[in-house]
């Protein structure tokens, strides 16, 4: 389409090459790194972490992993268990059951999305260990991650903005013949117990 002079807006996931008019999306690597730094702060730079990954064949999964690892660099935090839960809550619960069976000391679970973090919480709750660890997810949808933080299930969730409104606004600009940037990076917020009632805190 792009080579035939038809404008193309790429939303959410990066594509190979430059055959598009505008890419709109958040920076998953930056979000993962912010999560890593938040986790390092909460654990005072040391502890045992379980990482439940999204589909690692996808760029969001890869970026949320590499960003997180960068965020905990230079700390004594150990990732003692990691598994690909394919973005699915039941898979995350199953993987967390394995982690709980293998490790007595788990300080925090970092999941690449909120359903993953919730699945891990349910697994820990089933063994009466949910109070022994913290749970962190990504996406921060109002009815999901943000609601879980308000209920005290998750300790934090990092927003992944979907960019629908920005995509429509960009499409209208293109139709009006206005120029648009090649890349629009959307900002993100963290919602934790300290700020969730105030609408979260913007990431720098």
Give residue ranges: language-model regions.
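Solvent-exposed loop/turn segments at secondary-structure junctions
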Residues: 14-17, 29, 55-59, 85-89, ...
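Short, amphipathic alpha-helical "lid/cap" segments that border enzyme active or binding sites
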Residues: 29-36, 40, 93, 161-168, ...
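Short, solvent-exposed amphipathic alpha-helices that sit
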Residues: 31-36, 59-77, 91, 95, ...
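Hinge/cleft segment of the Venus flytrap/periplasmic-binding protein
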Residues: 56, 60, 71-72, 162-204
């Amino acid at each position: 389409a792009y080579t035939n002079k038809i404008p193309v807006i790429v939303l959410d996931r990066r594509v190979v090459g430059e055959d598009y008019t505008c890419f709109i999306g958040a920076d998953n690597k930056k979000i993962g790194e912010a999560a890593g730094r938040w986790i390092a702060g909460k654990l005072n730079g040391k502890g045992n972490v379980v990482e439940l990954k999204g589909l690692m064949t996808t760029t969001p999964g890869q970026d949320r992993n590499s960003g997180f690892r960068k965020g905990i660099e230079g700390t004594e935090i150990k990732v003692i268990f990691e598994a690909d839960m394919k973005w699915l809550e039941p898979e995350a619960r199953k993987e967390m059951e394995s982690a709980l069976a293998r490790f007595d000391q788990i300080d925090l679970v970092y999941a690449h999305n909120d359903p993953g973090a919730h699945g891990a919480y349910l697994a820990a709750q089933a063994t009466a260990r949910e109070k022994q660890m913290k749970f962190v997810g990504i996406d921060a949808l109002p009815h999901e991650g943000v609601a879980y933080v308000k209920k005290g299930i998750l300790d934090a969730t990092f927003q992944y903005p979907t960019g629908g409104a920005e995509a429509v606004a960009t499409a209208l600009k293109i139709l009006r013949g206005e120029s648009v940037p090649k890349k629009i990076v959307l900002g993100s917020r963290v919602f934790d117990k300290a700020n969730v009632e105030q609408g979260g805190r913007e990431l720098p």
